[in-house]
Amino acid sequence: AQVINTFDGVADYLLTYHKLPDNYITKSEAQALGWVASKGNLADVAPGKSIGGDIFSNREGKLPAKSGRTWREADINYTSGFRNSDRILYSSDWLIYKTTDHYKTFTKIR
């Protein structure tokens, strides 16, 4: 199975298929496989997988808000060990942003 985990690769996939690539699993799916965030063991229990698809609450309001819009997040550039600070954020109406500093700043990419 092809692993798609770059900003451009995931953004293009989202806009084409309206879902994350198959190498993404949610936090609860990862936990069911034995993932423990504090152990950094995702690559051990789910080889080739990245965390993605969970709701991003946008509590700080740094992403554009609109009635009915929901945001989801996915890890980017993950290979193994502990998760990094790169995330892609995508909305229910297909706005796509990235953060490389764990949600401090956001840049629109699509």
Swiss-Prot record:
Its main location: secreted. It is found in: Secreted. One of its GO terms (cellular component) is extracellular region. The active site is at residues 73, 102. GO terms for molecular function: RNA binding; RNA endonuclease activity. CDD domains: barnase. Coiled coil: none annotated. It comes from the Bacteria. Keywords: Endonuclease, Hydrolase, Nuclease, Secreted. Its EC number is 3.1.27.-. Hydrolyzes phosphodiester bonds in RNA, poly- and oligoribonucleotides resulting in 3'-nucleoside monophosphates via 2',3'-cyclophosphate intermediates. Belongs to the ribonuclease N1/T1 family. This is Ribonuclease.
